[in-house]
Amino acid sequence: MKIIRVQDQLEGGKVAFSLLKESLAKGATTLGLATGSTPITFYQELVNSDLDCSALTSINLDEYVGLPVENDQSYDYFMRDQLFNAKPFKESFLPNGLADDLEAEVKRYDQVIAEHPIDFQILGIGRNGHIGFNEPGTSFAEKTHVVDLQASTIEANSRFFASIDDVPKQAISMGIASIMASKMIVLLAFGKEKAAAIKGMVSGPVTEALPASVLQQHDNVVVIIDEAAASELD
């Protein structure tokens, strides 16, 4: 696990984008993408670059269950707004949180990932150590699955909604085994509230109680953090 300390989120986005360019130069064609406030500066770098994404495939980590794609808090909307409207990809996959049969959707998404192995995966980390929507206690063997979101995750995401009652209670998420199958993982974390999770991920025991700790077992992980997120590291 390589740790790169940066001054702020802006620099973090630039460093992540430079790592992406290196991966693309080595033949990467499929990107695993994340949502939320953490990767926004990475997407800004991508949008402002002259990079042609028309031959690339993207696979998103997760999507809320039951949120229409036109809702500005759906991850489908987020990806179009932050990236796809400006940089169309050859193919862009997201879980369908409106599927009538969620179990069939889970199987479909696992098939998508199997057919498009991820070369470069962007991750954030939750305050409770979740990656994607893989909450504490999720099996490391899990592939795509329907998740009941924990209260801490609902609370953390409520700032994006008019009311905490509007936050979806479930999501479809790529599983930990799916994430670990990525050839390279770049995890971004900024801010003091991520410091405890970063400490556990980097130096704590590998435990399903802190999902991100599994990344210690991956042989190509780069962690990009600001000083606040790094503040509990030795």
Swiss-Prot record:
Keywords: Carbohydrate metabolism, Hydrolase. The keyword Hydrolase applies. Belongs to the glucosamine/galactosamine-6-phosphate isomerase family. NagB subfamily. It is an enzyme of class 3 (hydrolase). The lineage of its organism: Bacteria, Bacillati, Bacillota, Bacilli, Lactobacillales. GO terms for biological process: carbohydrate metabolic process; glucosamine catabolic process; N-acetylglucosamine catabolic process; N-acetylneuraminate catabolic process. CDD domains: GlcN6P_deaminase. SUPFAM superfamilies: NagB/RpiA/CoA transferase-like. GO terms for molecular function: glucosamine-6-phosphate deaminase activity; identical protein binding. NCBIfam families: nagB. It comes from Streptococcus equi subsp. equi (strain 4047). It comes from the Bacteria. Its EC number is 3.5.99.6. The keyword Hydrolase applies. GO terms for cellular component: cytoplasm. It catalyses: alpha-D-glucosamine 6-phosphate + H2O = beta-D-fructose 6-phosphate + NH4(+). PANTHER family: GLUCOSAMINE-6-PHOSPHATE ISOMERASE. This is Glucosamine-6-phosphate deaminase. Coiled coil: none annotated. The active site is at D62, N128, H130, E135. Catalyzes the reversible isomerization-deamination of glucosamine 6-phosphate (GlcN6P) to form fructose 6-phosphate (Fru6P) and ammonium ion. Pathway: Amino-sugar metabolism; N-acetylneuraminate degradation; D-fructose 6-phosphate from N-acetylneuraminate: step 5/5.
